[in-house]
Amino acid sequence: DIRVIFASHQDPDICSSLAMWLDLNPAIKTYCSWLWTGFVSHFSTGEVITLNPIPDQGMRIRIGDEGPEVEAVPAHYCHSSGNFSLYDPTAGILFSGDIGGALVPDHHASLVVTDFEQHIQYMRGFHLRWMPSTVALRGWTQRVRAIKPRMICPQHGSIFEGEMVGKLLD
């Protein structure tokens, strides 16, 4: 019973399945940065996808007609110029997209980060290559500190919770 799709940014690992989801349920509301609406609308099997643009400052997104709201948190230039994380204030969970992502070998993989110093080696290369702007990352960390998530869930790698949230933001 999917009602909303949130595309954190324009990459195919986020958007390439949109057409299939919309074929299953054309009523799904799809949100992405205004910057990428023209680009992402072409991830279709024929018809152009209609998207709900997210302004640069972010926005609240209602899940369904009377459901809870989640917040699109700006993460611009943290991998993509029109990038957002998604915060669920009810659960206290921030879905960070690629921020905090890691390429963890199978023999070290775990659902949750328990040793930040061990884990950072799997994050370093990706972040240096795809998120080289410390100014952009500082802006994101300030916004995230203000909302105080109890958990940060990147789309690649392990989850940060408890004290590991603070270590990631530091």
Residue ranges and their predicted role:
Residues L22-L24, L111-V113, L169-D170:
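Glycine-rich, phosphate-binding/catalytic loops in enzymes
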Residues D13, G38, I159-G162:
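Short, active-site-adjacent cap segments at secondary-structure transitions
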Residues W21-L22, V40, V144:
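Broad structural signal for hydrophobic residues in well-ordered alpha-helices, predominantly aliphatic
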Residues Y31-E163:
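Metallo-beta-lactamase
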Residues D1-Y31:
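Active-site metal-binding motif and surrounding structural segment of the metallo-beta-lactamase
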Residues A27-I28, E161-D170:
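Short acidic, glycine/proline-enriched helix-loop-strand junctions
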Residues L18-M20, F43-T45, H108, V165-K167:
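Short amphipathic alpha-helical segments
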